[in-house]
A protein has these predicted regions:
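Cysteine-centric redox/oxidoreductase cores and disulfide-bonded domains
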Residues: 81-168, 173-186, 190-196
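Extracytoplasmic thiol/disulfide redox context detector
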Residues: 2-83, 87, 149-163, 194-196
Length: 196
């Protein structure tokens, strides 16, 4: 009897570990651009950050047109949530993600509609309502309770602090060096042109 119980426990633990490993395999870095690009930009962002939304509205479209679509730059979006609403949005953005950045752009374009609420629960409800209106198909409960995704998001933040001393958003890293100029397209373009 004890052997049977032990065998069942081992099977359950092994099955859960296998599921966890499978979940880890589907977590993909959100990025755009060629993997062979000479320049890699890493952006540390909080989905509730107004300056991050401004970057996506006013800088990113030109960056994409002039550098990313031409194969010169690859951009990777890293999570650096500054509050619980951003943390939950990061988990949702990473859940069932195929590596494309569409959901990130959707969240920034409607940031003022969902990134509000007096409680974390209210902000999460606003997020769910906003994405439902946008026809984004996500299992909210499953995504928000997924420990692997939670760890993935938190590890982005930890790595940002340890490796690049990130303390604000957005923080732009270009080929492993922090971009320390005012974040506008003119400055970014000038910097990138020197690297090409």
């Amino acid at each position: 009897m004890k052997k049977t119980i032990l065998l069942i426990i081992i099977m359950i633990v092994g099955f859960n570990a296998n599921l966890s490993a499978q979940e880890n395999q589907i977590i993909k870095r959100i990025s755009e651009g060629s993997k062979d690009a000479k320049i890699t930009i890493i952006t540390y962002e909080s989905l509730t950050c107004g300056h991050c939304a401004d970057f996506h509205k006013n800088v990113y479209p030109e960056l994409k047109k002039d550098f990313i679509e031409k194969g010169l730059v690859r951009i990777e979006f890293r999570h650096f949530p500054l509050d619980i609403a951003a943390f939950n949005a990061s988990k949702i953005g990473q859940c069932n993600n195929d590596g494309k950045s569409d959901i990130i752009h959707i969240l920034y374009s409607g940031q003022k509609k969902w990134a509000k609420g007096k409680t974390p629960e209210e902000a999460t409800a606003n997020l769910e309502s906003f994405l439902t209106d946008k026809k984004v198909n996500v299992d909210f409960k499953k995504c928000l309770s997924n420990k692997d995704i939670e760890d993935y998001v938190l590890n982005d933040r930890i790595e940002g602090v340890k490796k690049f001393k990130v303390n604000a958003t957005p923080t732009i890293i270009i080929n492993d060096k922090k971009f320390d100029k005012a974040l506008n397209y003119k400055n970014l373009k000038k910097y990138l042109e020197k690297l090409i």
